[in-house]
């Protein structure tokens, strides 16, 4: 016996999401059938709306409804700093911190030889272009993830930007605040020692 | 900074699903934005369709597009056995086994004093009614889960149905096929010894 067509379709839909296999998708599909109709309708509309109404900011690559995005359009922000991140969601994380008031640039990925992703597949050309056209940008802070790909991308960007006389910095590596040295991995510990600061 | 409204709405939508919190929902929402438009549209429509086109079978309580469901409507199936399950998805599991050819009845839950769920909240009245109107039903196989609530519900049903002279059976408990005795819990092992069969 097959699942009724509407369930089978819904299971297929859920299975398109990352980390959701046949079993989870089936569970979610049956849960959906028990959900309030309003919630399902709202969810369904939100899916379409997110796809239809959101675009990438033509300046920084952030996800936005308008263009440019609210950060690029905000002239009260520090126009001398550009923080480079891998994904739009990283901007949200930085903004939650409330301590950075400069601009952003989203690469939409990192260089990854394994996935065949080179610099030309990333939002790098527009960053270089942006730096050339805005001489008031004094520092580029690279905030790619602390993965091998993130490090390689940071290194590549640094070599590309430094010759133009712009300061390039990288987020510090070290122990998480509140964490035990005992549980830190060797690489993090090494970075923490290497980057030790005077008290 | 807040997420753009369409993303916030989509995150809300995902958070309505079981086991998906703020972080997972955010990840899924951003993933959705990168999905192919066709896939998102299909998913969105499937949500609405599943809610709109599916109903419970008026006879057995299974989820179905038509009424009665394809199993109740299939007169070639063994009309003398009714297998009682907690949820519609349990029917799919049984059907995959391909060894049971009788009918089903879905309780839509189990008795649970903690959740304040009594017999009157389950699809039990219609089961009794069905047994009374179909004298050709000779055996009711109770296949609720092997949880305390499932056991209690099985016991309750057994006491309710037996006096009518209908045979009531329960799925066997025991070791999983291919499993090691070493890893079986005491309760399962006890049930396996208790239910031992002659060779």
UniProtKB/Swiss-Prot annotation, chains A, B:
It comes from the Bacteria. The keyword S-adenosyl-L-methionine does not apply. Keywords: DNA damage, DNA recombination, DNA repair, Metal-binding, Zinc, Zinc-finger. Residues 80-176 form the Toprim domain. Pfam families: RecR_C (PF21175), RecR_HhH (PF21176), RecR_ZnF (PF02132), Toprim_4 (PF13662). One of its GO terms (molecular function) is DNA binding. A zinc finger (C4-type) spans 57-72. SUPFAM superfamilies: Recombination protein RecR. One of its GO terms (biological process) is DNA recombination. Gene3D superfamilies: 3.30.60.80, 3.40.1360.10, 6.10.250.240, RecR Domain 1 (1.10.8.420). PANTHER family: RECOMBINATION PROTEIN RECR (PTHR30446:SF0). Belongs to the RecR family. HAMAP family: RecR. May play a role in DNA repair. It seems to be involved in an RecBC-independent recombinational process of DNA repair. It may act with RecF and RecO. This is Recombination protein RecR. It comes from Levilactobacillus brevis (strain ATCC 367 / BCRC 12310 / CIP 105137 / JCM 1170 / LMG 11437 / NCIMB 947 / NCTC 947).
